Swiss-Prot record:
<keyword id="KW-0007">Acetylation</keyword>
<keyword id="KW-0479">Metal-binding</keyword>
<keyword id="KW-0472">Membrane</keyword>
<dbReference type="GO" id="GO:0005739">
    <property type="term" value="C:mitochondrion"/>
</dbReference>
<feature type="modified residue" description="N6-acetyllysine">
    <location>
        <position position="86"/>
    </location>
</feature>
<feature type="binding site">
    <location>
        <position position="116"/>
    </location>
    <ligand>
        <name>Zn(2+)</name>
    </ligand>
</feature>
<dbReference type="GO" id="GO:0004129">
    <property type="term" value="F:cytochrome-c oxidase activity"/>
</dbReference>
<feature type="transit peptide" description="Mitochondrion">
    <location>
        <begin position="1"/>
        <end position="31"/>
    </location>
</feature>
<keyword id="KW-0809">Transit peptide</keyword>
<dbReference type="GO" id="GO:0005743">
    <property type="term" value="C:mitochondrial inner membrane"/>
</dbReference>
<keyword id="KW-0999">Mitochondrion inner membrane</keyword>
<feature type="modified residue" description="N6-acetyllysine">
    <location>
        <position position="121"/>
    </location>
</feature>
<dbReference type="GO" id="GO:0007585">
    <property type="term" value="P:respiratory gaseous exchange by respiratory system"/>
</dbReference>
<dbReference type="GO" id="GO:0031966">
    <property type="term" value="C:mitochondrial membrane"/>
</dbReference>
<feature type="binding site">
    <location>
        <position position="91"/>
    </location>
    <ligand>
        <name>Zn(2+)</name>
    </ligand>
</feature>
<feature type="binding site">
    <location>
        <position position="93"/>
    </location>
    <ligand>
        <name>Zn(2+)</name>
    </ligand>
</feature>
<dbReference type="GO" id="GO:0046872">
    <property type="term" value="F:metal ion binding"/>
</dbReference>
Length: 129
């Protein structure tokens, strides 16, 4: 048992010595090109990068962000984007409600939630692709 511990300690010491540079100082490795930890913008690739760049411009091409709530009245309905003529919508009605009221929303005039009376309106949206 003791020999196994000594062998392990010797291996760790050898690795530490190999990690040191020729001057005896520990070699430094940089994570980012400028040194330090890279930012999210430097590290993001693919779809994540596209979303971050669009968010800087104030856009949400993939509907990642929560929709902006309106007052829900007939004059100022909640706008629901859709690529078709109808879409199923879920209304929570009240903050502490534990169930969701689902109903179909069709293109045209604003429609009301059957339970709470909040108004929703379907608006056309193009795909980001």
């Amino acid at each position: 048992m003791a020999s196994r511990l000594l062998r392990g300690a010797g291996t760790l010491a050898a690795q530490a010595l190999r990690a040191r540079g020729p001057s005896g100082a520990a070699a430094m490795r940089s994570m980012a090109s400028g040194g330090g930890v890279p930012t999210d913008e430097e590290q993001a690739t693919g779809l994540e990068r596209e979303i971050m760049l669009a968010a800087k411009k104030g856009l949400d091409p993939y509907n990642v962000l929560a929709p902006k709530g309106a007052s829900g009245t007939r004059e100022d309905p909640n706008l629901v984007p859709s690529i078709s003529n109808k879409r199923i919508v879920g209304c929570i009605c009240e903050e502490d409600n534990t169930s969701v009221v689902w109903f179909w929303l069709h293109k045209g005039e604003a429609q009301r939630c059957p339970r709470c009376g909040a108004h929703y309106k379907l608006v056309p949206q193009q795909l980001a692709h």
